[in-house]
Amino acid sequence: MPLPNHHPLQRPLGCRYQFPDPMAADPDGEGLIALGGDLAADTLVCAYCQGMFPWFNEGEPIAWWSPDPRCIIYPSDFCASKTLKRRIKNAGWTFSLNLAFAEVIAACADTRAYAQASTSATWISPAMIEAYTALHAEQVAYSVEIWDDDELIGGLYGLKLGQAFFGESMFHRVTDASKAAFFVLMQLCAHSQFAWVDCQLPNPHLLRLGASILPRAEFLAGLAQQLSLPSIDWSSICGQKLPLNQLLNEDLMTYYLSPTALQLRKLR
């Protein structure tokens, strides 16, 4: 079913639906913008580029949201707590990027299912997993993993478009492991010059990590600017486990993302 096309924005190349302008379609700021469509890769990219994301329970129509206000976090201002830094320094954990995307999104889905056991509902349905896995294959969706030896103990996933990152979900199996994954993401985005990371909806956990609230209009204006900037290549750091405590030295993330690091990987 085509999405409503009232107050249309310019349609990005390859998008099969015309999404409505969130500001015009939802002047009261309730957040719900449209129903219907599909979860094809081009549809998802078009939605995110226009400040919307899918959020619905399995068996319900696909619902597209653009909440007002919007929850974001500034990577350049993020400061890990002393407790988290101590945990990162002493735990002996490693981190990776895009080494176990399927396992991360499945773990996030399980976490949501357990949290909502009374309703047996989770918004990370099999259809959503399939859709974001397809985006991962297109190098749009990324995962951050935290490891204790060979055990995956925490992680998160989201989308990278231009110089914008859209966080989707995180999980932990060991205390502080999801915070460690968030720390890695903040380091990545800060050293990639991302102005902010979209966290979608505020919650106490994100606010404790330093998230802020933006009016939707301000978020959409900033998003347009971030999407216009060239995407930073993260391939030099993908697919390998690296010592997490090394990121306490901020210069190392700059090195990991450098052309020199990428060239050394190609020579291995």
Whereabouts are the PLM-identified features?
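N-acyltransferase acceptor-side catalytic subdomain
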Residues: 1-268
